[in-house]
């Protein structure tokens, strides 16, 4: 199982490196195309000159600022162009075909006003069409760039979540190995106490059976998560669409887990902010009101009807970043709740006592 995790981790690393390399290649290719376009524009224009470092025309850090400056410059050039175009049209209307000079009209001349209105109308029509075409092309470019960026972010997020799930698998594997070590220690202790009564032998056998049952559940959960990770990794490598579906499945699984926690917390007390279970040590730890910590230790043996009872209780509070035991209150609630089998009701009473202790 450990070898499978190593193999899966290496595969995820290789795939992630490949995606990052491809993204970097696309970025470098885009920068080269922009660089070539700028150089070609400089070569074909008498008004543009290259200054500074000729080997690095593009500074990525200044790209957004320079892009806005270029937009302003292009707007000024368009206005200059249309002024020249307007002058050209005006001269065409005011100069005869035989190139003879005609009297210059005054600003108040009706014919001058008519020609000026016609030139302005033609200019506005052409500018409107061209600006619409430019806006449409610009919008399409921005839309495609936005879609590419979203897909890249989704792929990167998928690999990050896959890595987090893999870390959880390692934690489960460590827990499983610790349980195996504890089982071996338990077996050694059992071998040294073979002279106990038949009842003790049956109890030890039952405890071993419970431990093996927990190990089997842990092993099944670990194997299921490994299988799910392999499926997610295969989907991420095959296509971006399947990767998005894996992200949705992961989010849905986390939502189900959160919903289960919320229902458990709501059934006990509304001030509970965290619940942690330790199955092997038979402990239950609660975080209440972001200040109090309650630890419940259950009896090793169950009652005749198969129920667990409270064996010990620890209470702590936080004051000025220090954890302080609540000894007096612990004695009281332990005396009241020790041996109780209604765990949920006991937890409600303990939480109320802890919260009301400072009031």
Curated annotation (Swiss-Prot):
Family, similarity comment: Belongs to the KRE28 family.
Pfam families, per database record: Kre28 (PF17097)
Coiled-coil region(s): 59-81, 111-132, 210-239
Top-level lineage group: Eukaryota
Name by which UniProt lists this protein: Outer kinetochore KNL1 complex subunit KRE28
Subcellular location per the Swiss-Prot or TrEMBL entry: Nucleus; Chromosome, Centromere, Kinetochore
Keywords, comma-separated and alphabetical: Centromere, Chromosome, Coiled coil, Kinetochore, Nucleus
One GO BP: homologous chromosome orientation in meiotic metaphase I
